[in-house]
């Protein structure tokens, strides 16, 4: 799954839990749950992977900034923790590019690789998931403002 979607799901988790440690841990768990769900992937070589990964990583960082900015002050730390936890397991990819190895033990990398349910024709799932997570996060963080009768009928 795209890291942007992991970030947005982490924002939902942080907004829902409102506590830093549970948000971080739930974010990590959510990463593996989402990676086990059907999603877009199966890149044919590193150049194609990088064409997707670089813009996705930058968009993920932008979403982290946006969701942190949208979050009310009292929820910001939990939202940031949820997003960080949700994105953390994918640090293996840039670590391999820049340092030649994953920061995680082999058993974690093997599990992460084994659970992937990717196919090249599932981009629509990524878009749908991203929209759903973004709307849920903004809804939880900003709330649905109710109109009073006085606002509708002067």
PLM regions: where:
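N-terminal membrane-targeting hydrophobic helices
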Residues: 1-154
